[in-house]
């Protein structure tokens, strides 16, 4: 709280970065300057101190799903993906999705929740063909270069990115960090998973994201029925319980 009173930091972020390879240093600086001037003008109008920093780049996992775009600065795992998403057991979407033909399985945590398979495709992102799949084989250095581009031209705080790498790339990563240390604040590193392996191959009941072939993706999408969103909204409203247990202003989790 004290830091916020002193710094007045903003968090104006970007998402879907890999879908816009046309955005170079000039365009990113225009975006940064627009965000800064907007924040400064609002601070001046409200009689508040101007923020120390305005722009950042967050993980953007949840909001990107709402926007139907790629997450922050990250490149997707593959062109065609089955996203296995957890829904709580009383979510009104569950029966609607079941009737529409979506694959639904009980969550292995045993709480009564559900795991529902949602198909996702990225037709405007470049991938490498490996067998029947089109997957992300981007090198660690390419990911770090994207981080540097954003840090140099848009970000004032830090760019959140998890760099997937192979052990054979460690020497190149160290060399890059030493060369560009002044451009670097901090990133996460994660050993690259083999996109060709399934949940069964890895000993898990399911994977949060499973790369699939175009044929498998198309077959699943073709099996799905349209969803009546008005019905979903009505069921969501009906699901609100305003009984005595809600009298204190907070309803219990169902």
Predicted stretch roles:
Residues 1, 6-8, 59, 66-239:
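Catalytic alpha/beta core of large soluble enzyme barrels
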Residues 13:
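Residue microenvironments linked to proteolytic maturation
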Residues 50-51, 61, 157-159, 247:
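A generic structural signal for well-ordered coil/turn residues at beta-strand boundaries
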């Amino acid at each position: 709280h004290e830091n916020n009173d002193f710094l007045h930091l903003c968090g104006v972020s970007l998402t879907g970065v890999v879908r816009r390879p046309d955005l170079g240093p000039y365009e990113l600086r225009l975006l940064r300057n627009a965000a800064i001037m907007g924040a400064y003008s609002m601070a001046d109008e409200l009689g508040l101190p101007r923020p120390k920093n305005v722009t950042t780049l967050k993980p953007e996992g949840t909001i990107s799903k709402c926007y139907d775009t790629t997450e922050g600065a990250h490149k997707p795992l593959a062109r065609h993906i089955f996203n296995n998403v957890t829904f709580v057991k009383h979510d009104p979407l569950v029966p609607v999705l079941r009737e529409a033909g979506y694959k639904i399985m009980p969550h292995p945590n045993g709480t009564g929740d559900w795991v529902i398979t949602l198909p996702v495709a990225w037709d405007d992102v470049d991938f490498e063909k490996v067998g029947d799949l089109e997957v992300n084989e981007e090198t660690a250095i390419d990911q770090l270069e994207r981080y540097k581009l954003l840090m140099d031209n848009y970000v004032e705080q830090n760019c959140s990115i998890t760099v997937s790498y192979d052990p054979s790339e460690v020497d190149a990563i160290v060399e890059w960090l030493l060369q560009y240390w002044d451009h670097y604040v901090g990133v996460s590193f994660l050993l690259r998973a083999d996109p060709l392996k399934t949940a069964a191959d890895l000993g898990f009941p399911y994977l949060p994201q499973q790369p699939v072939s175009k044929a498998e993706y198309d077959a699943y999408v073709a099996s799905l029925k349209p969803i009546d969103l008005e019905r979903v909204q009505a069921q969501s409203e009906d699901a609100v319980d305003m009984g005595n247990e809600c009298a204190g202003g907070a309803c219990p989790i169902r």
